[in-house]
Structures are given as C-alpha cells and as structure tokens.
Amino acid sequence: MARVAVLGGTFDPIHLGHLAAAQGVLHLTGVERVIFLPNRQPPHKQGQPVTPAEHRAAMVRLAIADNPAFGFSDLELRRPGPSYTIETVRALAAEHPDWEPAFIIGLDSLLAIRTWREWETLMQSVDFFAVTRPGHDLAAARRLLAELGPRLSGRVRLLEIPGVAVASADLRRLAAAGYPLRYLVPDPVARYIAEHRLYLRGESHGDG
C-alpha cells in the first residue's frame, strides 16, 4: 500500500500556502506523495461563484509540475454535485485500492468536522493531518480532540508548518484590482491568470 496524503480544495487559485503545506506534510509525516484534488463545488460554498473547473485544474497542474512527489487527481471534478469528503474517500478506495490515504485539512476545517457529512464514519475511515502555521493557538483543537475521545482523535495529527499567510479569496480581490500576484502564486500560475484574464472585474468565466 502506498501511503499518500490528499490535499483537497477549490484552488481558486492555488497559491504558495497550499504548496508549503503539502511540502511540510511530506517532510513531517513520511508519506510518499501528496495528491492535489480540486473539488467541483465545495459544500460550504454552494451558491457562490467558482472559477470553471478547467481553469482551476490547469493552475494546479502548472503549480505542481516541477515536484515529482506531488500528484493530481480529477476525481471530484468528474463527479457532479457537491464534493463531500466521505464520498471522495469511497471513490478513492475503488479507484486506487493500492493507496492508503490521509487527508490534509486546515485547523478551521478540523474544528468544523462534526458538521461534515457522515463525519464519524469519515474519521473512522482515514487519518487526518490538520495543519496550521507555527504560533497559532491550538487550544480549541486540543479540546475538540479530547471531546472526540481516543478512538477518533487518534486518527488526527496536528502539524505546525511554516507557510505563506495568504488566502485564495484575497488573491482574487488583488487580481481584480490589478495587483501583481507574483511571489504569492507560482510564476506559471501568475502567467496563466494573466493570460486568461481570470478574476478581473467585469470578466465572465462561468460555465454557462
């Protein structure tokens, strides 16, 4: 079985913070690869506009192309409807029976995990790496793990990983204002955004 970590996200756009988190997980956990898995429609963002999947997938592929330890999966992009993690876990097991996956999530996602679909089944099925930057208060996360008990909390590992304090929503606002994204996203991604005029005010990139 290949031990892999799965980093799901909207990646709208992918940025250096995502890549730093993935590299940190590689270094700290001993997984063989990190698989980037863009989602079609995150359940917590239903109704919000999302850049078409082909653009987001292209940006992820460009961002990870120079790292052989990074891989790409379009599994969620091939499935209609919201991307629920429990369904992804089952689909990955069917599509990649040789993988032993763990999921990379942010600390905010860990704190909200009891709102996820079939969350107890999910936590019994896979391990989680909950990542945060050094210096963040972990008290709330530790309280949650204590409440979950050893059976479920044993599936979670808290990881402090140095990274870039940037959010995709902020990058979209910066791009809309004409601010250069160089040094915030990989250079090939910055060029792709510019070439395809993504995130500019008044530009439409919707699927319809």
Curated annotation (Swiss-Prot):
Known EC number: 2.7.7.18
Biological process (GO), any one: NAD biosynthetic process
CDD domains, A to Z: NMNAT
Metabolic or biological pathway: Cofactor biosynthesis; NAD(+) biosynthesis; deamido-NAD(+) from nicotinate D-ribonucleotide: step 1/1
Alphabetical keyword list: ATP-binding, NAD, Nucleotide-binding, Nucleotidyltransferase, Pyridine nucleotide biosynthesis, Transferase
Gene3D superfamilies membership: HUPs (3.40.50.620)
Keyword NAD among UniProt keywords: yes
Superkingdom to which the source organism belongs: Bacteria
Transmembrane feature ranges: none
InterPro entries the record matches: Cyt_trans-like (IPR004821), NadD/NMNAT (IPR005248), Rossmann-like_a/b/a_fold (IPR014729)
Catalytic activity as recorded in UniProt: nicotinate beta-D-ribonucleotide + ATP + H(+) = deamido-NAD(+) + diphosphate
Molecular function in Gene Ontology: ATP binding; nicotinate-nucleotide adenylyltransferase activity
Function: Catalyzes the reversible adenylation of nicotinate mononucleotide (NaMN) to nicotinic acid adenine dinucleotide (NaAD).
Family in the record: Belongs to the NadD family.
Entry protein name: Probable nicotinate-nucleotide adenylyltransferase
Species whose genome carries this gene: Symbiobacterium thermophilum (strain DSM 24528 / JCM 14929 / IAM 14863 / T)
Lineage: Bacteria, Bacillati, Bacillota, Clostridia, Eubacteriales
Gene for this chain: nadD
